[in-house]
Amino acid sequence: MRLIAFLLTTVIASVVVADDHGSAPAPGDGAFVALMVQAKDPDAYIEVMKENTAPFEALGSSVAGVCVTKTGADYPGQMFVWNAFDSMEQAMAATDAYDPMKAPAELAALRDVKYNVMFKPLKAFELEPNSERLWRLKISPSNVAAFVGKMTELETALRAAGHDMNIGVFQPFGGGTHETIHLRAVSPTYAASGKVIDEALAGAEWMSIWGAAMGLVDEIISDNFEHCQVIYTAS
């Protein structure tokens, strides 16, 4: 079931620098706040949050969920809690509504907070969390718009080839020295993700689009697989 569709709307000046790549794609609606943590027991932490929705209600989130790092973790228990909002205004207002460093003792005992950050989707993105490959990418501002355009083209090609895949590109705000552009490739299962990789390695026609997009990337900072899920939806 489609939970949320972030459709094309306004333009963020910081990521739509005019250049030889032509018209810049418009970002998607909505915004996210992410709290990066180290959980002592991710499953236990997630269950407690499912049972205690007060923090999500205080934030005013439309939808909230978690992503647990499954491969390439920087530390044991690497995960983050995300909250979806209708706008950057609402996302940034959430920082006044809830301080994760003052969480109830039951929650605080289950995780160590690393940092928090806000993200804006730079293309339409359907929120259907499951098997997710996340790349953190360093991309020159002058190439971001073209990269987003290539990811939109790639998503269309993958779906035409029979893959149920959502691709997201996200601009961080307030991420300190930790964050860069996020690229997410979301499939309904890990097996489905693996099938895409098999076809890529076999020289699928759509790989030419991927190659052109990677030519716009200065550096791949990290590459992980995560398992993501929704744990709260506003009533």
Q: How would you describe each model-predicted region?
A:
Residues M1-T9:
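Sec-dependent signal peptide recognition
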